[in-house]
A protein has these predicted regions:
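Short hinge/gating elements
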Residues: 8, 24-28, 73, 101-102, ...
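Conserved P-loop
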Residues: 82-160
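Interdomain "pre-motor" coupling segment immediately N-terminal to P-loop NTPase/helicase cores
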Residues: 11, 16-67
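Walker B motif beta-strand of ABC-family P-loop ATPases
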Residues: 163
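Extended interfacial segments that mediate partner engagement and assembly in macromolecular machines
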Residues: 53-105
Length: 281
């Protein structure tokens, strides 16, 4: 009865991790060999892990990352200019702590979005809030927000996150209201948040994308001067993966065909057997 009351109170206080650990301890006889301090430490540790996992789940849900990418899945095998030392430096999230930016450029399919999402995922692990936007989508949302009067709230939401991910920047030349909105976002975030940009185009081409030289200078000043840069090169990772899958499938088909041939009886052997049978008759 006392145990049931204790469990009820733990759940009522939202200490689910501690309650689960307590229930496990009750069912394990060897727990009696541990001291009270050791058992209590186990309860607290489980509650801490439970709380941290819940918080991480909320941060990832809020971030709305395009890809379920993480640092552990980073591929360094292909020669595309991705240095392990650069990623290891960014994994520490010091760049976020000091409100620096990150710019990832390279051809289509080079893995820019994957790397960007992996770094944002790592930021969420470290307790930072991230928010992902595909470039056309963020401008579309801002255009709608201007019409229905939500633009102030939207800009406030964007400015408050620790890491803002803008994916596929520069797909089209910006219109006047777009680059002004974007400058306002960067101005609000300058010195208080980190922005991660992925783009097919090098930063030297961004003046043409923005259009207005004065605004372009202001945007690049806020984005580029304190940014970590990852410049990817080479063939599309998607094409390489597809080609690798095709080779793997072809090899698998070849193995299956050879296996099938071994199982299939040789017609010449059957003819020889029939001849022998005829001779005996």
């Amino acid at each position: 009865m006392l145990n049931e009351q204790t469990m009820h109170k733990l759940y009522a206080m939202k200490l689910s991790g501690m309650a689960e650990s307590y229930e496990e301890q009750r069912q394990q006889s060897q727990m009696g060999e541990l001291s009270f301090e050791e058992r209590f430490a186990m309860l607290v540790e489980r509650q801490w892990i439970w709380k941290e996992n819940r918080a991480l789940t909320r941060r990832l849900k809020y971030a709305k990352l395009k890809l379920d990418a993480c640092i552990e899945d980073m591929d360094y095998r292909h020669p595309r200019g991705l240095r392990r030392s650069t990623i290891e430096q960014l994994v520490s999230c010091e760049w976020i702590k000091y409100h620096r930016n990150c710019i990832i450029t390279g051809p289509t399919g080079a893995g820019k979005t994957f790397i960007g999402c992996a770094l944002a995922h790592q930021a969420c692990r470290e307790g930072y809030r991230a928010l992902y936007f595909y470039t056309p989508k963020i401008f579309r949302q801002m255009a709608i927000a201007h019409v229905d009067g939500r633009i102030t709230n939207l800009l406030k939401k964007i400015s408050r996150v620790d890491v803002l991910v803008i994916d596929d920047w520069g797909l089209a030349t910006l219109e006047r209201h777009q680059y002004r909105d974007f400058l306002e976002i960067l101005d609000d975030r300058h010195g208080s948040g980190s922005t991660l940009i992925t783009s097919q185009f090098p930063t030297s081409a961004w003046h043409d994308i923005i259009g207005d030289p004065t605004v372009a200078d202001a945007i690049l000043d806020r984005l580029v001067h304190n940014a970590h840069k990852i410049e990817l090169k080479g063939e599309s990772m998607r094409k390489k993966k597809k080609r690798g899958d095709e080779i793997t499938n072809a090899a698998e088909d070849d193995r299956k065909e050879k296996k099938e041939k071994k199982r299939r009886p040789d017609p010449s052997d059957q003819g020889s057997d029939n001849a022998n049978l005829g001779g005996k008759a």
